[in-house]
């Protein structure tokens, strides 16, 4: 019997997840289908109960349901609980279990371009929103010991740092101070929407004095190269856009659902083609 997977969100028509997962199913000769479900906020509970009743094997959760979904699940993974958001649900033994693969997916994506263990790196996170929180907690969970957080509102950065129970040395910075101290970091991670299409001329941090070999990663992938990545490349940095995070978090969800590891490079090239790259 064909297994059913999917993604719920609103809007959902733009999602690249169905293309990516269905290609992986076909490539691995698996009898499965991944579908995008438009689910409005006021019917989220009914939709989740309906998916469970239909016997869906697993599904992703995107905007605006990542927090609200937690009220309708049977179990939540400890890391997802700490992050406060779920983006992947596994249906196992009659239970819906929530996970967060965003942060772990990002960590795996970052490791894929780093020649050295991340645990030894000094990291600067730009932003203190939901994406930053997932990445911060996942980096801490992976054993990274130095993670500073820069945000327009410094108090929000302080709140993010205070919420983490892991042993991490962290300082909350203003964006102005982070700009001055950018040369002290091995990795800079841009987690805000600043620089996303159509406001491509904006950047949260003017890149001017990076040290050699710095990695600059931006979770945005439209455009492929944001202003911060362009400036970092001019400084000789190793750059990474958000496609890697999207692919790795999806691949991790696929692995959780099926027990099979998909071809990451195949997934990545498919997404790039679909985005017109």
From Swiss-Prot:
Pathway listed:
Metabolic intermediate biosynthesis; chorismate biosynthesis; chorismate from D-erythrose 4-phosphate and phosphoenolpyruvate: step 4/7
Pfam families, sorted: SDH_C (PF18317), Shikimate_DH (PF01488), Shikimate_dh_N (PF08501)
> What Gene Ontology cellular component terms go with this record?
cytosol
Task: Provide the GO biological process annotations.
Answer: amino acid biosynthetic process; aromatic amino acid family biosynthetic process; chorismate biosynthetic process; shikimate metabolic process
What are the alphabetically sorted keywords of the record?
A: Amino-acid biosynthesis, Aromatic amino acid biosynthesis, NADP, Oxidoreductase
Q: Which residues bind NADP(+)?
A: 127-131, 151-156, 219, 242
Q: What interactions and quaternary structure are annotated?
A: Homodimer.
Protein name (record): Shikimate dehydrogenase (NADP(+))
- To which species is this protein native? Bacillus anthracis (strain CDC 684 / NRRL 3495)
């Amino acid at each position: 019997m064909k297994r059913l997977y999917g993604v719920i969100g609103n809007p959902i028509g733009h999602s690249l997840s169905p293309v990516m997962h269905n290609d992986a199913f076909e490539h691995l000769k698996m009898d499965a289908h991944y579908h995008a479900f438009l689910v409005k906020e006021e019917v989220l509970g009914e939709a989740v109960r309906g998916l469970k009743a239909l016997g869906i094997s697993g599904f992703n959760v995107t905007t605006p349901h990542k927090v609200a979904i937690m009220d309708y699940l049977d179990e939540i993974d400890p890391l997802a609980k700490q992050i406060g958001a779920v983006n992947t649900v596994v249906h196992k033994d009659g239970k819906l279990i929530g996970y967060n693969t965003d942060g772990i997916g990002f960590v795996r994506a970052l490791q894929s371009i780093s020649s050295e263990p991340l645990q030894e790196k000094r990291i600067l996170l730009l932003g203190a929103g939901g994406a930053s929180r997932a990445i911060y907690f996942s980096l801490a969970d992976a054993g990274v010991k130095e993670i500073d957080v820069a945000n327009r509102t410094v108090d929000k950065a302080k709140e993010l740092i205070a919420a983490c129970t892991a042993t991490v040395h962290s300082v909350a910075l203003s964006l102005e101070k982070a700009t001055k101290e950018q040369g002290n970091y091995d990795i800079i991670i841009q987690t805000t929407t600043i620089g996303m299409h159509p406001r491509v001329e904006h950047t949260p941090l003017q890149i001017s004095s990076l040290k050699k070999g710095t990695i600059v990663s931006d979770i945005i992938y439209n455009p492929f190269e944001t202003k911060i990545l362009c400036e970092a490349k001019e400084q000789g940095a190793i750059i990474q856009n958000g496609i890697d995070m999207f692919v790795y978090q999806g691949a991790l969800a696929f692995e959780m659902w099926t027990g099979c590891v998909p071809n990451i490079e195949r997934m990545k090239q498919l997404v790039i083609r679909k985005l017109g790259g």
